[in-house]
Swiss-Prot record:
rRNA-binding among keywords: no
Gene: fusA
Binding site for GTP: 17-24, 81-85, 135-138
Domain of life: Bacteria
Record keywords, A-Z: Cytoplasm, Elongation factor, GTP-binding, Nucleotide-binding, Protein biosynthesis
Entry's family note: Belongs to the TRAFAC class translation factor GTPase superfamily. Classic translation factor GTPase family. EF-G/EF-2 subfamily.
Predominant location: cytoplasm
Cellular localization per UniProt: Cytoplasm
Summary of the function given for this chain in its UniProt record: Catalyzes the GTP-dependent ribosomal translocation step during translation elongation. During this step, the ribosome changes from the pre-translocational (PRE) to the post-translocational (POST) state as the newly formed A-site-bound peptidyl-tRNA and P-site-bound deacylated tRNA move to the P and E sites, respectively. Catalyzes the coordinated movement of the two tRNA molecules, the mRNA and conformational changes in the ribosome.
Name this polypeptide is given: Elongation factor G
Recorded GO CC terms: cytoplasm
Record GO terms (molecular function): GTP binding; GTPase activity; translation elongation factor activity
Amino acid sequence: MARTTPLERVRNIGIAAHIDAGKTTTTERILFYSGVVHKIGEVHEGTTVTDWMEQERERGITITAAAISTSWRDHQINIIDTPGHVDFTIEVERSMRVLDGVIAVFCSVGGVQPQSETVWRQADRYSVPRIVFVNKMDRTGANFYKVHDQIRDRLRANAVPIQLPIGAEDQFKGIVDLVRMRAKIYKDDLGKEIEDTEIPAEMTELAQEYRTKLIEAVAETDDALMEKYFEGEELTEEEIRAALRKGTIAGTIVPMLCGSAFKNKGVQLLLDAVVDYLPAPIDIPAIKGRLPDGTEVERAADDDQPLAALAFKIMSDPYGRLTFVRVYSGVLKKGSYVLNATKGKKERISRLIVLKADERIEVDELRAGDLGAALGLKETFTGDTLCDESSPVILESLYIPEPVISVAVEPKTKQDMEKLSKALQALSEEDPTFRVSVDPETNQTVIAGMGELHLEILVDRMQREYKVEANIGQPQVAYRETIRKPVRAEGKFIRQSGGKGQYGHVVIEVEPAEPGTGFEFVSKIVGGVVPKEYIPPAEQGMKEACESGILAGYPVIDLKVTLVDGSYHEVDSSEMAFKIAGSIAIKEAVMKANPVLLEPMMKVEVEVPEEFLGTVMGDLIARRGQIEGQTVENGIAKVTAKVPLERMFGYATDIRSNTQGRGIFSMEFSHYEEVPRNVAEAIIAKNKGNA
């Protein structure tokens, strides 16, 4: 089957922003103007297309990255609407991994918010080109120029306005197009009747000033244009657009647009900018992967190359288990067998679908550059690579942050117990930052996630979708343990008691690894002193032992283990014996290697009226917080701090009472840090007391 849309006319884009910047409304308007939906949905009415979960429609926030296809000017645009709440960082992270470009939506009143910085950093991590849409220009306090300065100062981005607003707040009535040097005046409520006219006289000077800045920015992308500019020649519209596209894709320019999605202003011009400036799959560097022997390879966006696709999301659905994939090269066909190279398992694609709003359309194939969902995959999870069996490759997976908060879940009846295990399995398949474990001491089921809202929504889904009745415990901090010095240790497991004995023996070197590494294992066994079939069980034994540390029973992370020596017995050695030997060795090593307790530190941003600044800072310091910065602007003080999560429970209530209900704060996970000795001793004593 031939490709219906040429690859250069495909755009895979995300819409990302701070919560409440108007992201979902912007997506709805894009779908309305491009003809996918015929009635505009409103977030505050709970009728939007991309917010499909009940919790999303009730709370007016987008939780899961919904993927939708539409078209504009003969281009196919695949859109992922990402959540703006910090507890759903994984949704933003996984969508950034499979996108080619991003529309970053900012509120013209709020400007650059803490979550905007997080989303921007995630886009930086994957080098995703972006354009900025300054939304809500009709709101009281709207200021396009303030947002422009904040993006340049706080995000260190080369934001270049290609539009200016005509009027603001309730006087916002149109847009100056700096590329064409024309004005667009909106004549009706639906924003479909637009008058193309001269720039208003009172704005010509300002428009000229920003036009010059635009020309200077694009001239820097190309020596020939720079020469033309210095010689005083006018650049043509085509030259400006081509240079803007080149700069945007290279990440050296971020075009800025403005509008009011809710009032239907500026959305068609935003769609034009997506087509004009954001990259097609062939405009971005080829995806990198590894062959089974570790060699690095590239796969270009080309239907004729071998298949390489990344699973970026799992969703349970009336249809069955949907695995969302991005095809980077080759063609994924319905009914075909593919290799999950990450797991080394063969899988069958029973059906393929693409989403158009909340309609699912079955297709026979997905080609290079396409986004869609596959049914029938049983072993494939987020971050896994699907490829041709004859040409295996493993693509770089996603960055999955450690959960920071946990609660115990107790089913109310035996029937609930069965429903709970089914619900937890499905939810953890969908969301890799949601972890489930069973406490070996208490036999309690413990769920962990990225924040209180994250767990609240997951518990809500268990109750609604899976009809589980359960008691939920108090939130607990997800502490971790690690080591501080390199050591050598050995583990021997020998049993002789008549008949076949047991024999396993390993020698390991253990050293601290980079934060975020988790557990890293390397074998340097030579000459078969430990047969290769016994190395994976030994590694497994070590991994399992690290799930419960020696200080307080928390998982041990960020260590590198090298298997350097060992011995075996022709008759008595077995996989189980080496698994136990591995476990003994790692426990001895951790005990000798200066183990320490780690706690999650949160990046906290607080905004309060200036008169409460002293109270709020004193309170943060009392919570073991480290103040990192403070600013005061228009009577509003902003404080940035790093604070242990353990001291942030109930902060929402405290800040309200400390500021007469006028303070707001946001919090996201920053990193794990060593717990001060006096605090650590209390935690360890408490855990040993419970054991």
